[in-house]
Amino acid sequence: MIDLKFLRENPDAVRESQRTRGEDPALVDALLEADASRRAAVLAGDNLRAEQKAFGKKVGQASPEERPALLEGSKELAAKVKQAEAEQHEAQAALDAAHRAISNVVQEGAPAGGEDDFVTLETVGDIPAFDFEPKDHLELGESLGLIDMERGAKVSGARFYFLTGFGAMLQLGMLQLAAQKAMANGFQMMIPPVLVRPEIMAGTGFLGAHADEVYHLADDDLYLVGTSEVPLAGYHSGEILDLADGPKRYAGWSTCFRREAGSYGKDTRGIIRVHQFDKVEMFTYCKPEDADAEHQRLLAWEREMLAAIDVPYRVIDVAGGDLGSSAARKFDCEAWVPTQQAYRELTSTSNCTTFQARRLGVRYRDENGKPQTAATLNGTLATTRWIVAILENHQQSDGTVRVPEALVPFVGTDVLKP
């Protein structure tokens, strides 16, 4: 949730953020109205309770003759207090609903527009110039015994797969390398639960416009996570953190689940867009004033991993209309996929400022010992989709694939052969 104090002082900035996202700026006015109504209801209730307290003292000091009339007045006042409390509760519920309808305030400098309006910040590496017709990742994966989509579909349905043999080792090696790099940079490794309570899923912002992307176990009222960002954000919910020595950094290794409800007909071939995949995700809690610098650090660590797998990629500044509701700014790294003649997302890092932490009640103490809302950030360090870029960019004319040098110790071979 956004900071209501910021909203009251900067309503035009929040309206502009809504426009940048392509969302309704009128929601800002609805929130301001709900905020004013709730504050008025609280004031009215407080005044009545103060009056009730003073009236109670008057009753206690009254003579026997005066008391019956005063008691009758006390009953009337009690009824008014009860009504005021009901109105306050109703006003709070309306405020909560209006508050949750507003996405995070887009950071100044982020591009306006939608999915195609990103700004390319840098392009890294040389696009391979093959002297043969390159195969796509699925053809390579099947011919080398790395990917089995047919049996994945037989067992689980469309967009499921088996990683087999060195395909499994390639993923495990990639994730293990990511875990080692995370630990070397001060992250605490975590294997989190992949089922979370509704309040944790909602707190991270995943039950808004894209709620249909999330798997829900209705009988247990639990959600399957699409990223370990969710349980890691909930890890310190309701706590006051000690950030005096700098950010708290966690790296979660988990299986992730996405319904891909809005992706019918898109990327139906191979493992680019699937219902289940594995990922190592970086997650940071820090002071708000440290968030921008931390965002750049997360991006730098992602780039280190992409350098390790030796694929050409570009870094983009994602436009406001393509941001998730929790993100104020997002940078993606997209790798070149030769057979698509296009760049495809491999990593994403988001600065969620205080949006998630405010929902989840994560705070820290400032230099005066006063609790303040923390900032949260996240970023991909490795995920299943990377196999696509590795296979296609490192394929050779004889149908084999060269294993990136950094992954050889984990995979156990330097060339993937039939």
Curated annotation (Swiss-Prot):
Gene3D superfamilies: Bira Bifunctional Protein, Domain 2, Serine-tRNA synthetase, tRNA binding domain
EC number: 6.1.1.11
Keywords tagged on the record: Aminoacyl-tRNA synthetase, ATP-binding, Cytoplasm, Ligase, Nucleotide-binding, Protein biosynthesis
Molecular function in Gene Ontology: ATP binding; serine-tRNA ligase activity
An annotated GO BP: seryl-tRNA aminoacylation
Coiled-coil region: none
Ligase among keywords: yes
Pfam family of the protein (one): Seryl_tRNA_N
Enzyme class, broadest EC rank: ligase
First-listed, main subcellular location of the protein, grouped into a coarse class: cytoplasm
Record's catalysed reaction(s): tRNA(Ser) + L-serine + ATP = L-seryl-tRNA(Ser) + AMP + diphosphate + H(+); tRNA(Sec) + L-serine + ATP = L-seryl-tRNA(Sec) + AMP + diphosphate + H(+)
Cellular component GO terms held in the UniProt record: cytoplasm
Binding site for L-serine: 227-229, 281, 380
Annotated binding of ATP, by residue: 258-260, 274, 345-348
Family: Belongs to the class-II aminoacyl-tRNA synthetase family. Type-1 seryl-tRNA synthetase subfamily.
Domain notes for this protein: Consists of two distinct domains, a catalytic core and a N-terminal extension that is involved in tRNA binding.
Subunit architecture: Homodimer. The tRNA molecule binds across the dimer.
Name of the protein in question: Serine--tRNA ligase
Organism per entry: Rhodococcus jostii (strain RHA1)
Gene: serS
